A protein has these predicted regions:
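Conserved alpha-helix/loop element of class I SAM-dependent methyltransferases that forms part
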Residues: 10-29
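Class I SAM-dependent methyltransferase SAM/SAH-binding core
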Residues: 38-79
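A short glycine-rich, Lys/Arg-flanked "PGG" loop and its adjoining helix->strand segment in the class I
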Residues: 103-117
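Conserved class I S-adenosyl-L-methionine
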Residues: 28-37, 118-143
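Short alpha-helix
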Residues: 152-169
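A conserved beta-strand element that flanks and buttresses the S-adenosyl-L-methionine
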Residues: 91
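Conserved Class I S-adenosyl-L-methionine
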Residues: 158, 171-235
Length: 235
């Protein structure tokens, strides 16, 4: 594959790979992935971590994960079916922005984690014009999702992710940010905008706002989001 052919590809797999590297650097013997979906992270750890568990609320995704031999149970982030300090590392991949009560989920993960919690979340470097435009478009899109009943918040900052931790906590907190700057095709951005508008019974106001965002996008371009890796580790 030529270098040019990768310039408009979503760098998401790169960020997920770096998350796995960070996780394996901690040499866990057991991992629980919360909101594991079909088990992509667990599958990538199969030959590297002795004990793997996943939790997800979606029975369809659970069945897909189980079909390839992964140990995944139905549950949610607020009541993990594990004893205190029974799992080395608890992970969240692009999950916090789908949770109505992240502090509660983090507290529950820290209860279960023997060594700590790792989080992979989206992140924008808003000092870059194409990133700022992308962040504004995403905020517009997520507002529509929320209006139609979905829990879909903006990507939380590292400060927001750790705000609920007591100031006197003995956790070691580390943050890494990653950005592979690749531009999105405008046709894809426009198509996704129209798809979001179709969810609304009266989309006129949202359409006007979208047009303003698209005008900015034609000036700056729209780049894929970066990612932040947050580690909350027991000292």
């Amino acid at each position: 594959m030529s270098e040019t052919s990768t310039l408009d590809q979503d760098p998401d797999p790169i960020y997920r790979g770096r998350f796995v590297e960070r996780l394996l650097a901690l040499a866990p013997r057991s991992v629980l992935d919360v909101g594991c979906g079909t088990g992509g992270l667990l599958a990538s750890l199969r030959s590297k971590v002795a004990e793997l568990h996943g939790i997800d609320p979606d029975p369809v995704r659970i069945n897909e994960a189980r079909a390839v031999g992964l140990r995944v149970d139905r549950g949610d982030a607020y009541a993990l079916p594990f004893d205190a300090q029974s799992i080395d590392i608890v992970t969240f991949q692009f999950v916090p922005h789908h949770l109505a009560d992240w502090p509660r989920a983090l507290a529950e993960a820290l209860r279960v984690a023997r060594h700590g919690v790792l989080v992979l979340e989206g992140w924008y470097d808003r000092s870059i014009p194409s990133q700022e435009t992308a962040a504004q478009l995403e905020a517009w899109s997520k507002a529509i999702d929320r209006a139609t009943g979905m829990v879909h918040e903006d990507y939380p900052s590292a400060g927001a992710l750790t705000a609920s931790l007591p100031a006197t906590s003995h956790q070691r907190i580390e943050q890494q940010t990653h950005l592979v700057l690749r531009m999105r095709a405008m046709s894809d951005v426009e198509r996704e905008g129209e798809s979001q508008l179709a969810k609304l019974p009266a989309p006129d106001q949202a359409r006007q706002l979208l047009q303003r965002h698209l005008a900015a996008a034609r000036r700056t371009g729209v780049s894929y989001e970066g990612a932040t890796i947050l580690s909350v580790l027991r000292a």
